């Protein structure tokens, strides 16, 4: 066996063997327990970053571990290939989005393979391929016919730079998530998926996901936002209609002093017809986003409409205002304003001099009435007892809720109602690089779904990309005939939100070669996904949409389980220091390879200089690796220098998977040193100790029959004790402590002074017996160690196994099992205390009786010293732990 570790040779050899044998190709086998392990598929941006490496290594470690546990494992890979970056790249580089995407996927596939992932590449999919999105279009037409997809004109978030609609979740602080442009509100006809029809189920079945992080489930619960409240009707002053509002605080109804409506509300539009100033304000409001998150930060603005409504219980006239903090499309697009007990209303009322009436005295707030001239305090919004509310005075929250709801219902002016914050999913995008919406517009027949036999509606690839969608400028593509009447018609030129593709890809992996159906019975074998791995940033967008889409497929008879992902692991970020200089009021960031960093003895940064000029640079915060902060590390360069196993080992050892991983060059060096040492020590054993015996002699089947030297027996006990803890840690995905266990085992096997040293023995049978004892324990130790470490560093472990067990495959060996008999100890060490203070330790037989333990303790020199000849009052023995002598 080669004595020097050469990662390039080792990894190329292992990957070639895996590729040629097809060992990771998954096949359905009803006689075996399946395990479907999936990491969120990447967008083919061109190059892997360390976030990718960590994500896919975590998934691969789990997949390989489950494979060694004997399960039938599926771990596929593909490309989330539609999206705006491809269009932007096409404009910048003069290539088509399809060519750019394919080239990037080809390059990233090579990078992923260099990591040694146990992926079934035969199942690779790309969402931009017609054979994939054909079935998305097919399901769209079925859902459209059922009314679960519908078209309506609605106010949307319009990104003026990308010229497309954004979902509420894609608006961050009032700006588009990709372009960063301030969003506008526009009324656009678009298609919606009726996710609200599944709101109750999506909420309730979160309780059926114990394998999900509680944080993710809480985020989804809050986003779905189920609330119990009242619908309240405020009659128009002239009695012509009623203004409907929804409130979760009917107990504050008597404190309503005005009503606020959204700029798009019919009452607002009617009032603006003969009021140019009001019309201008409505237009201004259209430049705000439609996401609730914006409301907390935007300046509250409003304008009186000159219209009034009547309070349903006390008959007071309340003015109607247009307010920019009221969203059209959420609830009724109108709110009853109770400034004394709602922070937004309080701010608005103070700004515009509107009345503020206290109607609740909080049980936790020390106030009798709201201080209208002071600032807002949170206690104003707390539940309490009604005051200044007529017959409702003194009622607690629920009592007032029920009484007011009953009175409203009796008057025909309201009722109790349950409402969800969740809104239907607008999926139309005015972009080119996406799945075409399979609808044909006919002047006679209306919107007609494309018949199944005409699917897929293929996206043309020879296009010129500029602002907006080129499809609208291609009559040769959109001009067609109506499937119903045969008359002239036009195709829909909008494409689907790319989150639609990522909402069902996990299911298509089970049968990617099926050209006759979206899914087949193979999906029943593999689904649900047993372990899903991805970032918590997808908690609402992707994970909620995927759960919804899964239920759509279930109700269409395509899948037969309720949830797509049984267990979810949300990995932490990869973070690293930042380095910059202030130039012209802006920070110019430098990459880690551009600076010389000085550190203290613990590796903490002390300062940094720029290599090019030797002048200092500022060491900034430790932040997520990103292009904008220029603090990323190139995985490809690391793999070229150290090998994939070193990169994998470091990313698993540096932090638990669900926590942030702080990058450390010295940590990578340390991981490389460990693998070199593992190889060197294993080679030493194979070339020397093991070479003296046949493999059958080294493989022990009954350890009770093998005489072991005392130190080897103790070493074996430690190895199995460490393995037992590592097994527990693997199940909990604490891979960092698994690596620690591997290091501990190697330290035992590499102990030349203790484990291998037999210089004190004379030549002859005794020394030969010692050497054989060392060899069989070391052979078992390396056998256990290579299998324990295999999921994390598979290439080196595969190579070492072939040296340990020529002609066999480490995957066939299975996961190492703990020998409980090896854990038994002849003697144990106990702590000895005198009057509760530590005074020493004693060694006793493992099976010693309580009386024997007491005798040994009382005879101990340290105990005799501290009891000073006094007879003990009592002796407390805690089995296996300590003895406390009370003198």
From Swiss-Prot:
Xref: Pfam families: Anticodon_1 (PF08264), tRNA-synt_1 (PF00133), tRNA-synt_1_2 (PF13603), tRNA-synt_1g (PF09334)
Q: Which reaction does it catalyse?
A: tRNA(Leu) + L-leucine + ATP = L-leucyl-tRNA(Leu) + AMP + diphosphate
GO MF entries: aminoacyl-tRNA deacylase activity; ATP binding; leucine-tRNA ligase activity
CDD domains linked to this entry: Anticodon_Ia_Leu_BEm (cd07958), LeuRS_core (cd00812)
Intracellular or extracellular location(s): Cytoplasm
Q: Which family does it belong to?
A: Belongs to the class-I aminoacyl-tRNA synthetase family.
What is the recorded name of this protein? Leucine--tRNA ligase
Query: What is the native source organism of this protein?
Result: Methylococcus capsulatus (strain ATCC 33009 / NCIMB 11132 / Bath)
